[in-house]
Amino acid sequence: VSRIEDKKTTGYVFNIQKYSVHDGPGIRTIAFLKGCHLRCRWCSNPESQEPLPQVAVNNNRCIGTDKCHFCMDACPRGAVYSDGSKVAIRRELCKDCTDLACANACPAQGLNIYGKLQTVDEVMKVVEQDAPFYARSGGGMTLSGGEPFLQGKFALALLREARARFIRTAVETCGMCEQSVLLEAGKYLNYVLFDIKSMDSAKHKEMTGLPNEHIISNLKALCEEYPDKPILVRTPIVPGFNDTPEAVTAIAEFIEPFGEHVQYEMLPYHRLGTQKYEFLDRSYLMGDVSLDNLAYKKLLKYAHRVLKGRHHIPK
């Protein structure tokens, strides 16, 4: 594939975040790609799950359908309507809409778009703006999502182009992707952040929508294909799912044979994405569940002990 072709390759991106220090070494720019096979009950980025753009409705900003109806007039499908004095959307009518004229017509930003079709070159121009910070800190570009490898062609083109521009690369993956894409990406990745949520496949299916066998197989294949590549296995600790010493021990035993290049990190459950569910007219399935901070700290200490120096403490 030529660089000219790579630069023109397109994909759906829902955010580009600068100055991140939690998603790989150094200071990084994260490109968030849309689409994910999993439906984690605690997901903090619900806008990442569907592969196509979506409309977010923030009725706190809507000035009222008695004063304004630009969005309703702009929608070619009649999906936008007045629910009393505010805007509402018939989601089933706009599920595959990529025009989203309603959001572009809203003068108050009460409607916003999650997801934009961009070329590799457009993304890399943003990423490249902070190249001096990458050079000083050992940072670079991280692909995230969603599951970035769901848009395999686009993700691979981004990684190749970053390499061509001497920008270090990393990826955050849930592992639920085509193994061939993951292994091809390994050629262009300096660092991998790989989620292992649970070794219990039945619990995994209950909490994410899918079993874990394919994810486990993908991590094994990646470690075998690239035995020296730095990989950080991460587990979001979710109350009632994997917040036990037994769950951590099972993951520790799984990664132990892979060698010192595979490290481990626990991440605390949080509720920061709940408002986005409201914007998408979805229910947050974890309800009002919260993490017991004292129990989490004890679990951190336990992980540090059983992983014998391979356990990262989150920054």
Regions found by a protein language model. Name each.
Residues 41-48, 69-88, 99-116:
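Iron-sulfur cluster-binding cysteine motifs and their immediate structural context
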Residues 13-67, 88-96:
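N-terminal pre-triad scaffold of radical SAM enzymes
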